[in-house]
């Protein structure tokens, strides 16, 4: 009876997370080549000795989730050491969205049940592009997050201010934290307290730009976000991680960078080649020593 009532089992989260979203940039063949490049031992992306402290995750398009899942399973089957249940897998698989119901008459939508069955572990939700183009609301994102968590999937919820930086730094930070709180609160209220959640802080004005937001701005806003989370739900048992996205890439993590401010990075186009990923991984590994 106890096992029947047990909640969903979530994958363990190491200290630092690097999550790559391919959006709709790659064809299926390029995605398959890309994940094989990530898993290729000669490319030195995934190091066995760092898996308990650094997690790499890939979020491809929906069409290639299954072949990516098969590639990861094949890679795991070739590992010399057996996989412990408490050790994070070498590469987590994610999806770019899901629906807020498990199954039903929802043409074109993506079921969290189906994602779970294809070994998906993380679901990206509420990206600024979906909020702007498709009109997704904070409440819809929260419902999706709850549906994902119900299936043992970790919600990766994108948050970030729309308002641009002003001349007064304290006011800009206050506005940013306030806008993020409006996006965070419904999610925390919808999720079970033992469910993990990842928030990807992406200032909308930094997405797709040549340069990311300034480190001091990110640090101040993320500090405010942590205070907001503590105030909203101080009794939460599930892990809460905060990543930075928004033109994140190589050179952003090392000395003087984001390593002490956030729990990882949400990577986009700057990780579209294997060399870029390797550079970021090496930067993070240096900080873990």
Curated annotation (Swiss-Prot):
Family annotation (Gene3D superfamilies): Aldolase class I
Lineage per the UniProt record: Eukaryota, Fungi, Dikarya, Ascomycota, Pezizomycotina
One Pfam family cited in the UniProt record for this chain: TIM
Catalytic residue positions: 127, 202
Catalyzed reaction equations: D-glyceraldehyde 3-phosphate = dihydroxyacetone phosphate
GO BP terms, alphabetized: gluconeogenesis; glyceraldehyde-3-phosphate biosynthetic process; glycerol catabolic process; glycolytic process
Oligomeric and partner information: Homodimer.
Keywords: Cytoplasm, Gluconeogenesis, Glycolysis, Isomerase
EC number: 5.3.1.1
Residues where substrate binds: 23
Pathway in which this enzyme or protein is active: Carbohydrate biosynthesis; gluconeogenesis; Carbohydrate degradation; glycolysis; D-glyceraldehyde 3-phosphate from glycerone phosphate: step 1/1
Superkingdom of this protein's organism: Eukaryota
PANTHER family to which the protein is assigned, alphabetical: TRIOSEPHOSPHATE ISOMERASE
GO molecular function annotation: triose-phosphate isomerase activity
Record flagged with keyword Isomerase: yes
Predominant localisation class: cytoplasm
GO cellular component, one term: cytosol
Compartments where located: Cytoplasm
The protein's name in its UniProt record: Putative triosephosphate isomerase
Family assignment from sequence similarity: Belongs to the triosephosphate isomerase family.
